[in-house]
Amino acid sequence: MDRAQKAELVADLKSTFEGTSVVIVTRNLGLTVAQSTALRTKMREAGASYKVSKNKLARIALEGTTYQAINDLLVGPTALATSADPVAPAKVIVDFAKTNDKLEIVGGAMGETVLDVAGVKALAELPSLDELRAKIVGLIQAPATKVVQIVQAPAGQLARVFGAYAAKEDA
């Protein structure tokens, strides 16, 4: 890889770090190509990315970003998972690591907050942004539904009263 390619890779990584809300560092201890492809596919489906890059280039790209505190985690064969949704990559990686002992979670960062292994696992247990949005919409819609029911209830009662009078007069 020549200097121009390295500079392009560093610029690409830097833009990735600047546009993400979480970075998770994993150590790949002999993942096969099929396993790595399966992990990348799961990450893509979750809206995240998973990149293997040279540690030195990743360190250079981390300089000046909010994630530069994770420089110390970049030792050995590492890969970086990034996403705008902080929960998505954590869930995928934790689930994948449960079934595959060749993937080791090293840590990560969410903004300026550095996460250890336990922090990444705790992050994976949180609901995703889509789940939170669905809950908020449900909470917002519930009072509106109740208001409509309350407003319609007197009209329904009034209709029943008129129906009873009509039935009484017919009898």
From Swiss-Prot:
Specify the superkingdom: Bacteria
- Cystine pairs: none
Q: Which UniProt keywords apply?
A: Ribonucleoprotein, Ribosomal protein, RNA-binding, rRNA-binding
Biological-process GO terms, alphabetical:
translation
CDD domains, per database record = Ribosomal_L10 (cd05797)
Provide the Gene Ontology terms for cellular component: large ribosomal subunit
Q: Sorted alphabetically, which SUPFAM superfamilies does this protein's record hold?
A: Ribosomal protein L10-like
**InterPro entries in the record, alphabetically?**
Ribosomal_uL10 (IPR001790), Ribosomal_uL10-like_sf (IPR043141), Ribosomal_uL10_bac (IPR022973), Ribosomal_uL10_bac_type (IPR047865), Ribosomal_uL10_CS_bac (IPR002363)
Q: Is NADP among this UniProt entry's keywords?
A: no
Give GO MF terms, alphabetically: large ribosomal subunit rRNA binding; structural constituent of ribosome
Tell me, how does this one assemble? Part of the ribosomal stalk of the 50S ribosomal subunit. The N-terminus interacts with L11 and the large rRNA to form the base of the stalk. The C-terminus forms an elongated spine to which L12 dimers bind in a sequential fashion forming a multimeric L10(L12)X complex.
Q: What does this protein do?
A: Forms part of the ribosomal stalk, playing a central role in the interaction of the ribosome with GTP-bound translation factors.
The family note in this entry says: Belongs to the universal ribosomal protein uL10 family.
The entry's protein name is Large ribosomal subunit protein uL10
Its source organism is: Rhizorhabdus wittichii (strain DSM 6014 / CCUG 31198 / JCM 15750 / NBRC 105917 / EY 4224 / RW1) (Sphingomonas wittichii)
Please spell out the taxonomic lineage of the organism that makes this protein. Bacteria, Pseudomonadati, Pseudomonadota, Alphaproteobacteria, Sphingomonadales
